[in-house]
Design a protein with these regions (language model features):
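Short, solvent-exposed cationic patches
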Residues: 58-60, 183-194
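Extracellular/periplasmic catalytic domains that process cell-envelope and extracellular macromolecules
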Residues: 39-41, 77, 104-105, 149-152
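Structural microenvironment flanking redox-active thiols in thiol-disulfide oxidoreductases
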Residues: 56-126, 138-145
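N-terminal "domain-start" segment that seeds a small globular fold
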Residues: 2-37, 58-63
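Thiol/disulfide oxidoreductase modules built on the thioredoxin-like
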Residues: 116-184
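Cofactor-binding loop segments of dinucleotide-utilizing enzymes, especially the Rossmann-like FAD-
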Residues: 49-51, 85-87, 162
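Short active-site neighborhood of thiol/selenol oxidoreductases, capturing the structured segment around
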Residues: 35-60
Length: 194
C-alpha cells in the first residue's frame, strides 16, 4: 500500500511516495492520548521517532536546530509541524532537544511518547497504553518503518501529508534529510494545487 509518485520533470517529485500510515496511538507530554491521524489532520508534518543519546538522533536534532535558527522570524517556522516521539520521559531533558524547544522559531513542535504497543527495542518488554505486555504488535516506529519500506533502525522520520499519508521516509541519519523532508512537503502542497 505504498506507491511511488513519479514525474520526470522534477527530481524532488520523484522522491514523493504515497504510503497510508497506520493510525498509531501516542501520548502527549501532559499524559493525554492522541491518534496520529488527529495530530496530522490538516497539517504538514515531520514525524520523528527519536532515540535520544544515539549519534544519528543527535545529528537529526542538530539539523532541526539549524533549520529552526534560519527560520527564526518567519511566523510559520520551517513550514511544517514537528512531532518528536520519544521513548521515555527522561529523554525530554536531553541538551540538544532542549535547545530546539527553547529556540521558539515559530514551528509547532510537539513531544509525544509511543504507546501503540510492541517493544521499543529488541530487549525491552512490549507495553500498551495501560502498561500491560502487548501480544506481538509492532510499536509505532516499527510500524511506520514497515509502512514506509524502511529498515528498522532509529531514528525513523516520515514526511506526512495533512491527510495522514506518508510521502517520504528515512531511517538512521543522512545529511540533509530533515531539510529534504521540508522541501518535499512544500513540493507536495504545490503538486496538489496543480
Amino acid at each position: 500500500s505504498c506507491r511511488k509518485l513519479q514525474n520526470k520533470n522534477n527530481s524532488l517529485r520523484e522522491e514523493i511516495q504515497s504510503c497510508l500510515l497506520r493510525d498509531i496511538l501516542l501520548q502527549r507530554a501532559d499524559g493525554t492520548l492522541c491518534s496520529l491521524e488527529k495530530l496530522v489532520s490538516g497539517k504538514r508534518s515531520i514525524l520523528a521517532f527519536l532515540e535520544i543519546g544515539a549519534e544519528p538522533t543527535e545529528h537529526v536534532l542538530n539539523e532541526v536546530l539549524a533549520l529552526e535558527k534560519s527560520a527564526k522570524g518567519n511566523s510559520k517556522g520551517i513550514g511544517c509541524q514537528l512531532l518528536f516521539v520519544l521513548r521515555q520521559e527522561k529523554d525530554l531533558q536531553h541538551k540538544t532537544l532542549q535547545e530546539v524547544l527553547a529556540l521558539d522559531a515559530g514551528s509547532e513542535i510537539e513531544i509525544l511518547y509511543d504507546i501503540s504497543g510492541g517493544a521499543s527495542d529488541a530487549n525491552a518488554a512490549p507495553r500498551t497504553a495501560i502498561g500491560d505486555t502487548a501480544s506481538g504488535t509492532l510499536c509505532g516506529w516499527q510500524e511506520t518503518a514497515k509502512r514506509m519500506r524502511l529498515a528498522e533502525k532509529l531514528p525513523v522520520l516520515a514526511a506526512v501529508r495533512p491527510n495522514g499519508t506518508g510521502i517520504y521516509g528515512t531511517c538512521g541519519y543522512h545529511v540533509g534529510s530533515v531539510e529534504l523532508m521540508v522541501r518535499i512537503l512544500k513540493e507536495a502542497v504545490r503538486t496538489e494545487a496543480d
